[in-house]
Amino acid sequence: MVSVIDKLVFDFGGKTLVSLAPDNNTLCVANKNGLTKILKTNNPEEEPETLDSSKLVSSIKCYSNSHFLMTTMQGDALRYNIDSSQEELLARFALPLRDCCVIHSGKMAVFGGDDLELILLELDDETHKKHAIKIDEQVSQISYNSQMNILAVSMINGKVQIFSLTSTIPNKVHELNDYIVANSYDDTHRDKILSNMMDDIDKDNDNDLSETADPDENNVADPEFCAANRICTRVAWHPKGLHFALPCADDTVKIFSIKGYSLQKTLSTNLSSTKAHFIDLQFDPLRGTYIAAVDLNNKLTVWNWETSEIHYTREFKRKITNIAWKIQADSKTLDLVLGTWSGSIAIVQNLAESVVSNIPDQSVAESSTKHGLFVDSESDLENLEGNDDINKSDKLFSDITQEANAEDVFTQTHDGPSGLSEKRKYNFEDEEDFIDDDDGAGYISGKKPHNEHSYSRVHKTHSFPISLANTGKFRYMPFSPAGTPFGFTDRRYLTMNEVGYVSTVKNSEQYSITVSFFDVGRFREYHFEDLFGYDLCFLNEKGTLFGQSKTGQIQYRPHDSIHSNWTKIIPLQAGERITSVAATPVRVIVGTSLGYFRSFNQFGVPFAVEKTSPIVALTAQNYRVFSVHYSQFHGLSYSLSELGTSSKRYYKRECPLPMSLPNINSDMKKDANLDYYNFNPMGIKSLFFSSYGDPCIFGSDNTLLLLSKWRSPEESKWLPILDSNMEIWKMSGGKETTDIHVWPLALAYDTLNCILVKGKHIWPEFPLPLPSEMEIRMPVFVKSKLLEENKAILNKKNEIGADTEAEEGEEDKEIQIPVSMAAEEEYLRSKVLSELLTDTLENDGEMYGNENEVLAALNGAYDKALLRLFASACSDQNVEKALSLAHELKQDRALTAAVKISERAELPSLVKKINNIREARYEQQLK
């Protein structure tokens, strides 16, 4: 039964705001007179803690059980530690701040106000690094969708701007106009002269607030109290992240879908009552079935928004400031806490009981009804967590035949109580091995015994090296290029490349997927609800392919709305699973753990099926497919083929791949990256085709390998064209760093597009840093030699009396490569790049229209590097070495330059021999 409890918190009254901590027990109650009290809602008799806080509070956000943020009309952004009662000034601004929220799992905070910019502060950073985003109008209120990583900014001109926060720099993706109230804050109360004038003119301007109630409780003497300072424009987000609500200017609540930002339905209060603008609006945090709103008449209305029915309504005598939902200890009963302008709070107890949310989403409902493939990814930790002797790394190995006796994955109920067809329901009680913990990061809960707590996520580990001796029990895991594990978060990247990245967020019932792009001018980010637990993904410029490794379902979703998406079920044998998928605008490819290689056209029509060695990774470009295999007999191998319109051509078929599996030894027992190798036992971070169509692979050794001359089987070879560990070492000034990592995206000519990851994990987390570029460098340098050369340079500077402070700064700068060593590397790099480009031109012709100019520039760089080496040999009077280098020069003008260098070095015999080379080449050209 619903009951209302009034609790006086501040005897002196005043504007009082409430915010509830994630534990649903710690309630922060802030008063504008400079006090904040911490109440324990589960122990109402307990004496509350009292903190001295800032006056003129404008918003409060309790984002953890021990910290909350506060903004003030004086422009202060503050953070408070509940445990230590410590206040921390994060930033100060000239104009008032109006609202705040916390993003990226508490790593950053967003503040908005009258300064015409959004301020992002890094909370984890001691200096609280600030990022400012210019906006067109003053901020009214802000809110954050943690599931989809979206920030909604309401402005005083009535516009709502939606920003994607999936990358470091927020990206505006949509704008809603003419829905919310265009409302400017009334700050005349802050000016004493203006405030007195307004009091003398008319004390009854706020006739919107009149109501028949006790005058002692109804009248608020605070000059800040007026309709303009109470109206809510904040976007309310559904806990699943796929819907949001707006408090609209027509005094209705409008529900929108994040898919296309389309209006789903409109909720209104009782038509017989006096309508008024809303002062707060919130979805219930449990399942999002209910939405609560309070209007300027202090009338609380709670809707079941899915049925559009009013669940509860009540009009309060006290003036309400804001509201906060509370989940009771039984995890199903909901209370509502309301702040007031009189120093008290009201608690509406037993307001509602959570029911299973059945959010209407046509595309999801249709797909679910057709295929009934919802996958609950909570199955594989029962053995891991229930047995202390089992190691995390053991999850890499499992006899695949154990999966052969799996029971049916679900039961289907077609008819509901009403006799109408309903969405299928699934029973997972007996299906503990339905889906594996595919990232090995411990995010799947084991089957919970009745009346017992869930298992702890902390388990013992012991070493288990990966070698050919263990391949009999090797577990094939789903792989997507540059995919990341969940780790200990609720989100991960399914895949990423030069086009963009696909992320998924898991909640209690399903996953939510976001497809984001680096080129925001060309593509538009989109979201959808994933009921099937997709764990495979491939992104291209036209669309995205998703796959579920255990059920065999694949789905292709074009980026535009012109072409329709399609879904297909891949037949799987007992114990077989899809291990990798790839898609181009013309072909879709699926590989499995038993070696089935299936190809389809862009509309899902089967093109071919083939049996190979077990496939562990795939990528594709146009009609070409690069696949990696792994078997206990042959280790790692690769295939390169072209799927023509009428036939398939193999360039390479299951040839040895010069890579080894990562060795998980005792040293990695406590390694923070053990989760990654559980998730990806191959250690392949990504594989892709270069911009000129050459296969590339980036493994656990952080070296980029490129397949050269692959069109000629006798000449093909793997070339190490970049050792990223060496490049990081050079950029760090010769220091061995363990907190900077390279995450590959693509190879564009001679530049690796990548994400520079900072931190203990080798994979990128949220938000995604901006892509960086790293020029390829052939691995020819020796660290000890480079350090010796740089030390010698510093010693020379000391001899000539260089500034000591400047010298200390030099030590932190990038390692300088001596001229002779740099020339050797440039010579080799130019040679490799020119060979690759020549091979492309001879077989595929020009792809971008400037290949011949690029090739000429490469030949010039090649000869210049050789001439530097030639000059060094001449200065050392090493005629034989100089002559060998002269033979490698390509252009006649380079030979002419070599002659001049030889003359300057007074080596007449070398001059004569080089002239003979020139004459021989000239005669050969005449033939």
UniProtKB/Swiss-Prot annotation:
GO terms for biological process: DNA repair; DNA replication initiation; DNA-templated DNA replication; double-strand break repair via break-induced replication; establishment of sister chromatid cohesion; mitotic cell cycle; mitotic sister chromatid cohesion; nucleosome assembly. The modification Phosphoserine is found at S377, S379, S398, S463. GO terms for molecular function: chromatin binding; identical protein binding. Keywords: DNA replication, Nucleus, Phosphoprotein, Repeat, WD repeat. This is DNA polymerase alpha-binding protein. GO terms for cellular component: Cul8-RING ubiquitin ligase complex; nuclear chromosome; nuclear replication fork; nucleus. Accessory factor for DNA replication. It plays a role in accurately duplicating the genome in vivo. InterPro entries: WD40/YVTN_repeat-like_dom_sf (IPR015943), WD40_repeat_dom_sf (IPR036322), WDHD1/CFT4_beta-prop_2nd (IPR022100), WDHD1/CFT4_hel (IPR048591). The keyword Secreted does not apply. The lineage of its organism: Eukaryota, Fungi, Dikarya, Ascomycota, Saccharomycotina. It is found in: Nucleus. The modification Phosphothreonine is found at T401, T411.
